[in-house]
Amino acid sequence: MKLHELQPAPGSRKKAVRVGRGIGSGNGKTSGRGQKGQNARSGGGVRLGFEGGQTPLFRRLPKRGFTNINRKEYAVVNLEKLNRFEDGTEVTPELLLETGVISKLKSGVKILGKGQIEKKLTVKAHKFSASAKEAIEAAGGKTEVI
């Protein structure tokens, strides 16, 4: 195969439809837009969600809930991810960020209890689930709430 022999996959390239170029083309005169009306005009068409004057769905449905401005979102780390550290390491949010375990600090770090932990670690985080705290201490490690 040579560069000049390369061809696009069959059916992957479509020829542009040239509208308004005579009635014999099948897309002449009104260019496939039908007769008069909003959609035949330039810039014509209805806005997103418009239902012809009928009250649109988003206004028929009731409002619900609110956004809590005080919401805190924690970066979640499961126990199984902590096994990558050496025995006796002090695991801090900064270390987790450095090693790529978490991508952003957000409002802090929360350690959850999914998986097993085989290393003896000192873990410093903003929150711990009960099962995570139990598992870290059972492995001989320490937990510290920042």
Swiss-Prot record:
GO molecular function: rRNA binding; structural constituent of ribosome
InterPro entries in the cross-refs: Ribosomal_uL15 (IPR030878), Ribosomal_uL15/eL18 (IPR021131), Ribosomal_uL15/eL18_sf (IPR036227), Ribosomal_uL15_bac-type (IPR005749), Ribosomal_uL15_CS (IPR001196)
A Pfam family per the record: Ribosomal_L27A
UniProt keyword Ribosomal protein present: yes
Subunit note: Part of the 50S ribosomal subunit.
This protein's UniProt keywords: Ribonucleoprotein, Ribosomal protein, RNA-binding, rRNA-binding
Similarity field: Belongs to the universal ribosomal protein uL15 family.
Primary gene name: rplO
Taxonomic lineage: Bacteria, Bacillati, Bacillota, Bacilli, Bacillales
Source species, domain of life: Bacteria
Protein role: Binds to the 23S rRNA.
GO cellular component: cytosolic large ribosomal subunit
Region (Disordered): 1-51
GO BP annotations listed: translation
Ranges of biased composition (kind: Gly residues): 21-35, 42-51
The protein's name: Large ribosomal subunit protein uL15
